Amino acid sequence: TIQRGKCESPNDIQTTVIAKPALQPSEITQKAPSEPLVSLSDARRGFKTEKKKKKSTQQPVEQPPSDLFQVIKYSAPSGELAAYLSPNPGDGKRHPAMIWITGGDCNSIGDVWSAAPRSNDQTAAAFRKAGMVMMFPSLRGGNDNPGAREGFFGEVDDVLAAASYLQKLDFVDPKRIYLGGHSTGGTLVLLVAEYSDRFRSVFSFGPVADVSSYGADSGFLPFNTSIKNEVKLRSPIYWLSSIKSPVWVFEGTEGNIDSLKAMAKISTNAHVHFIAIRGANHFATLAPTNQLIARKILQDTGEFSNLSFSEEEVRQNVMQ
């Protein structure tokens, strides 16, 4: 079962969430360089995805505690979509903001406010606790939203629409909007970074290099996976050269590390940074690394982002 807004826990993890490569890393890296050197935005132009017909679960958005989040609607190409948004702090200031895409069923949102253990905190609570504005957008076909799930394709446009909503709020600094995500959400935010330089920095935890590794029966790929371009346009490894803003990719060596290694091996893009966290799993990276990111974002106030992370710094922060 795919959970709304949450990746499976480490004890009962399904292989459809921590993906096993359909291709070995060496096969992926041999395949990707032979592809045409075009940007993801150019490659997507005019492409019509062929979606599988699937009955929507139509689960309404769960109501959050009003002191932490409100439910809003933002306009996207697929229609009016729901999101959780931090309330206006009411201090007259513009604050940095984080859009976060959860793992598992990343089209839907659910409980992102209950306390979670440090070893598996998928709520990204570090950012709101640091005083940042948080937005958790649901995407097309998720919850009771209009539109149909496309599995890492049209959802890219929805995330960008969420950013457009945020930048118009008088309590958000439009030049300091960040994007992050975990697992399937990590894959999606990496694709967003490959498609657009809209975000000041992007943080991708545990993405896959090639979405076919999720498996046709995972529920994450509602399209014909036998069509090469359907898979390719959703697979981050082919479009790393398109990235034009700072991107940080994190994963524990006990998690979905093969994908990180495959992308790190092929990438020559100085905007993309890959950090393998020795001894950590797919989940333990989240809470401590998000705390580190949040602290640094509060100091990231210049015209251009000054964020930097070393592998040793991140590892020590996770293991302490």
Regions found by a protein language model. Give the residues of each.
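N-terminal cap/lid segment of alpha/beta-hydrolase-fold proteins
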Residues: 42-92
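Short substrate-entry loop that stabilizes the transition state in hydrolases
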Residues: 91-95, 100-147, 212
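C-terminal catalytic histidine-bearing segment of alpha/beta-hydrolase fold enzymes
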Residues: 102, 271-320
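Mobile cap/lid helix-loop segments that gate and shape the active-site cleft of serine hydrolases
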Residues: 110-111, 204-240, 245
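Alpha/beta-hydrolase active-site loop
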Residues: 150-170
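Alpha/beta-hydrolase fold nucleophile elbow
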Residues: 171-183
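Short glycine-enriched nucleophile-adjacent loop
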Residues: 186-197
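Conserved strand-to-loop "acid loop" that flanks and positions the catalytic carboxylate
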Residues: 248-255
